């Protein structure tokens, strides 16, 4: 079953609401012209995830939200050409209990040549671990989606 999609200028992460909601026709126009917009998946007030299109800046971001609308997982895609995206970073956050305070997380930073940096960070006390590795980059490519067809970008398990 396809989830409903709502559109806005951006999702305000700190206050957990949509800024400047827009109708589908305006969002479609912005998609075609490469202007920024955000697609909210599942709900306009408590989406399961959102997709931020900033093609004019060469990026697409995906934020996955838990039941408390906290962004626990983020994907950052870079536009590689007119049809393709490359996943350059995935960040997983851990929260303090039911609150919004981030207590730690892991970031995976990928490059198109197969290089990988894994960064684990805790905030109290502050600790950072970093490791380097390699990976098969072909799995990080995605087609730039057509308007309204975001399911390839919103796969939480990559």
Cite the ranges covered by each PLM segment.
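Generic detector of short, locally flexible boundary/turn motifs and exposed helical patches
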Residues: 3, 14-18, 39-42, 82-84
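Beta-turn initiation residues at beta-strand->coil junctions
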Residues: 51-56, 63, 73-81, 106-109, ...
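A short glycine-rich beta-turn/N-cap micro-motif
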Residues: 44-49, 68-73, 101-104, 113-117
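Exposed regions on extracellular, virion, or secretory-pathway luminal proteins
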Residues: 69-70, 81-84, 98-99
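Short, well-structured hydrophobic secondary-structure segments
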Residues: 35-67
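Short, surface-exposed coil-to-beta transition loops
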Residues: 36, 58-62, 73-74, 85-90, ...
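Long terminal segments
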Residues: 1-34, 89-158
